[in-house]
Curated annotation (Swiss-Prot):
It is found in: Nucleus, Nucleolus. It comes from Botryotinia fuckeliana (strain B05.10) (Noble rot fungus). Residues 1-52, 193-213 are annotated as: Disordered. It holds the Pfam family PUF_NOP9. Gene3D superfamilies: Leucine-rich Repeat Variant (1.25.10.10). RNA-binding nucleolar protein required for pre-rRNA processing. Involved in production of 18S rRNA and assembly of small ribosomal subunit. This is Nucleolar protein 9. Its main location: nucleus. GO terms for molecular function: RNA binding. Residues 1-36, 193-205 have a biased composition (Basic and acidic residues). The keyword Repeat applies.
């Protein structure tokens, strides 16, 4: 055997061979790392030489266009990693906070104080951790104002890096949003501020002397302004950063005092893909504070103006125009432009001497053909991203500038722009601001295109035209005729074509499931998901029903031409059920009454001719057993008994007929979840026992959803399933307690104990004796007299 093929045996030779292999691998790794460093250094030198040759510095500050963040990973500071024990502790704390299963608020406050004590000095690590950043968000949701201020102080000096971090940016957004209310409370409510200070001291009492030393005395306003000072000088790069752009929008909305919970604001704050970090049982319903405009200090308004001026100073016109079409920077630019145009002190025209965003985008007279402003607007009106900036301009621009843009760009081309899928949204913004004369001219131009718009299922334009005609008191006759011609002359098909659904599909979607066999369980009925065209068609029909005159008459005549089976199917389908609900509403005051139409429609639903429906039970019961149909019954209850509507007074007999139709099917309704809702909303227990009291209640509007319920009890289903729990209110006849009796078998009315016959007789006897002077005033035990019975 050759020597080179001989393999040494033994432990020492094996270890020696492994050491030699490891040395060879280390040498190869060193060589590869040196080559990698050389390649990186050469790339940096190439980039440096490229930037040195390029005189335009704006493009070099536009890193998001290449898919990188504003702050490079190499320049971002490293805060360290949590140890395994720390990660396990914080992970467990996150689970406990998410469950929120604490015996009391004091126990939860004590737990929060302990978590904050463990997290002291590790806040930056937790915020940047993929597994623990959710814990930081939940801590912020439950923190006191003093604890939030401490987080501000811990994050201070690192905000430019945190807002551009993948995980820490969400923590910053939550901290800013949850701290917005504290600014307003410190500004307007000194008493609340003192109360919160006392609560903060109690919450931090566990920290001892250290908590007193670390107490933050600065106002939340100053902490926000200090955060803005850190971000100053980097706004142009943050605008296009993948993560920081969202945080910057949050800051701008908080500084402007805009509502935080409105749908238009929420779309700016976060995307639909954002993970919703919540806490079980925590009340997150929108409050009056979050739905209305907030009071903010003047320093915040000055800060917005400074941000806009710094943004303009750091970017030239070419960069801002590129930003218009940038998917990340466009929403920030929209918000900055809206804040500038809605600020009274900076509301200037496009060719203003003051350098603003609008004057940068539209530097010259747009009415001149071939001007830079005209070229810019014509270039973005068809752009999927840039058209959103044009929507903002047409919505918030001053009247003089709006008229210039309308006459130069839209007036002669409005029909062609309305046909385009993207430009039509800009046209909608334009139509919302047109005068009556301009609106009538626009209708004349668009009317020949109605048939094409209907064929493409773009009914948004048609809906807006009808609504603006009602607002401007313009004639809708010609527009309604064009709509009727576009959908065809057959009234039986108008609603179905408008809702973009065939009769066969509608019947199959709303057909009852087949009965269950002994071997196979009953299949669960799954309704198909409505398409966008069905949704837009339903909205168009609802808008036409709200406009008295030809639009409403067109839909009403089409509904009356339908058989009962089709009306029932429309009532059961999730999208078209809203059309039936809108048709049941009374007509507005000072408009032609729709009483006759509503009476015919309701009669066709509750009293169909024999064989009109395929279901064995009456249509009212079919509606009661459907989640969509229950809304129809609620509309029938409120629209036939509304006390403020004189036209509904004569329809009350129909309401009684519906209640009579529900009575024989009480067991079937009580076995169904939706049936129990209908039985409760219609106060059927009161109808069954005391008809006169039921009539008074429904005529006064004191039905479910309108009455002031004093207490609630939760009832489980007959099988005890906790998932089938239905809330049941204590109504006037004692609904929610067996046989209308309260504790101790005493009847209750409106949440109060009803006096028995013997007690009433005693009162009468005592009053007579007192009047004759033969009886002393002795209060009855356990009885508190009120009103005329007080002695």
């Amino acid at each position: 055997m050759p020597k080179e093929n001989k393999h040494a045996r033994g432990r020492r030779d094996t270890l020696k061979r492994k050491r030699e292999e490891n040395l060879d691998r280390e040498e190869d790794h060193d060589n590869d790392s040196q080559d990698l460093k050389k390649r990186r250094s050469s790339q940096i030198e190439d980039e440096a030489s490229f930037r040195a040759l390029d005189n335009d510095q704006t493009l070099s500050s536009f890193p998001a266009a290449t898919g990188t963040n504003a702050i490079e990973v190499a320049d971002r500071p490293y805060y360290g990693l949590l140890e395994d024990e720390e990660q396990e502790y914080f992970r467990r704390a996150d689970e406990l906070l998410e469950l929120n299963d604490f015996p009391s608020d004091e126990e939860r406050s004590l737990f929060l104080a302990n978590v904050y004590r463990e997290a002291k000095g590790k806040e930056l690590k937790i915020a940047c951790s993929q597994s623990c950043s959710r814990l930081m968000e939940r801590l912020i949701l439950l923190s006191t104002p003093q604890q939030k201020k401490k987080l501000f102080s811990q994050f201070a000096g690192n905000f430019p890096h945190l807002v551009s971090h993948r995980f820490a940016s969400h923590c910053c957004e939550t901290l800013f949003i949850q701290s917005a209310s504290i600014v307003t409370e410190e500004l307007t409510g000194e008493e609340k501020k003192e109360e919160k200070k006392v609560a903060d001291v109690k919450a931090d009492a566990e920290d001892g002397e250290e908590g007193k030393e670390d107490e933050i005395t600065e106002s939340m306003e100053s902490l926000f302004l200090a955060t803005l000072d850190e971000l100053e000088g980097q706004l142009s790069s943050l605008l296009t950063d993948r993560f920081a752009s969202h945080t910057l929008r949050v800051l701008l909305i908080i500084l402007s005092g805009r509502p935080l919970e409105k749908s238009s604001t929420k779309s700016l704050l976060q995307s639909k893909k954002k993970e919703k970090v919540g806490i079980n049982g925590l009340d997150t319903a929108p409050t009056e504070f979050s739905l209305n405009k907030r009071t903010v200090p003047e320093s915040f308004l000055w800060a917005i103006e400074k941000i806009i001026s710094d943004t303009i100073a750091s970017m030239d016109r070419a960069f801002i125009q590129v930003l218009v079409g940038h998917p990340t920077g466009n929403p920030c630019l929209q918000l900055l432009l809206e804040l500038e145009l809605t600020n009274p002190s900076s509301k200037k025209g496009g060719n203003s001497e003051q350098k603003t965003l609008i004057s940068t985008l539209l530097p010259d007279d747009i009415t001149v053909e071939g001007s830079q402003s005209a070229i810019f607007v014509n270039g973005i009106v068809y752009d999927q991203i840039g058209s959103r900036v044009l929507e903002t301009i047409m919505t918030h621009s001053p009247g003089k500038l709006f008229k210039q843009i309308y006459r130069a760009i839209f007036k002669d081309r409005i029909a062609g722009l309305a046909r385009n899928e993207i430009a039509s949204y800009v046209v909608i913004r334009v139509l919302n601001r047109l005068s009556k004369e301009d609106l009538e001219e626009a209708i004349t131009e668009i009317s020949p295109q109605i048939e094409g718009l209907v064929g493409r299922q773009r009914t948004n334009i048609i809906k807006v035209l009808l609504e603006r005609c009602q607002v401007r008191r313009a004639s809708t006759e010609a527009l309604t005729k064009s709509i009727a011609d576009a959908y065809g002359s057959d009234k039986n098909e108008l609603i179905l074509k408008m809702a973009d659904i065939s009769l066969e599909t509608l019947t199959l979607a709303t057909a009852p499931p087949p009965a269950a066999d002994d071997d196979k369980p009953a299949p669960v009925a799954v309704l198909p998901k409505p398409s966008p065209s069905q949704l837009h068609g339903s909205l168009l029909a609802q808008a036409m029903l709200k406009i008295p005159g030809p639009p409403a008459q067109l839909i009403q005549s089409s509904l009356l031409a339908l058989p009962t089976s089709t009306i029932l199917a429309l009532s059961l389908y999730p999208t078209t059920t809203h059309i039936i609900q809108a048709s049941l509403l009374p007509s507005p005051p000072n408009t032609p009454s729709n009483l006759l139409f509503r009476r015919k429609l309701i009669n066709s639903i509750i009293s169909p001719p024999a064989g009109a429906t395929s279901t064995p039970q009456p249509p009212i019961i079919t509606l009661s057993l459907s989640s969509a149909g229950t809304h129809i019954l609620d509309s029938l209850l409120h629209t036939t008994t509304t006390p403020t509507s004189t036209s509904s007074a004569s329809l009350f007999s129909l309401c009684e007929r519906i209640a009579m139709s529900l009575m024989p099917y009480e067991p079937l309704l009580r076995d169904s979840w939706t049936g129990r809702i209908v039985w409760r909303n219609w106060s059927m227990d009161l109808f069954k026992r005391r008809r006169a009291d039921w009539v008074k209640r429904v005529k006064s509007g004191d039905t479910q959803g309108k009455s002031n319920i004093q207490s609630q009890v939760v009832l489980k289903s007959q099988d005890g399933n906790a998932n089938a729990v239905v809330g049941k209110e204590i109504l006037g006849d004692g609904i929610g307690k067996p046989h209308g009796k309260g504790k101790g078998g005493e009847k209750e009315i409106g949440g109060e104990r009803q006096k028995s016959a013997i007690e009433l007789a005693r009162e009468k006897f005592a009053a007579q004796k007192l009047a004759s002077g033969k009886l002393k005033t002795i209060p009855l035990k356990g009885f508190k007299a009120t009103g005329a019975n007080a002695i």
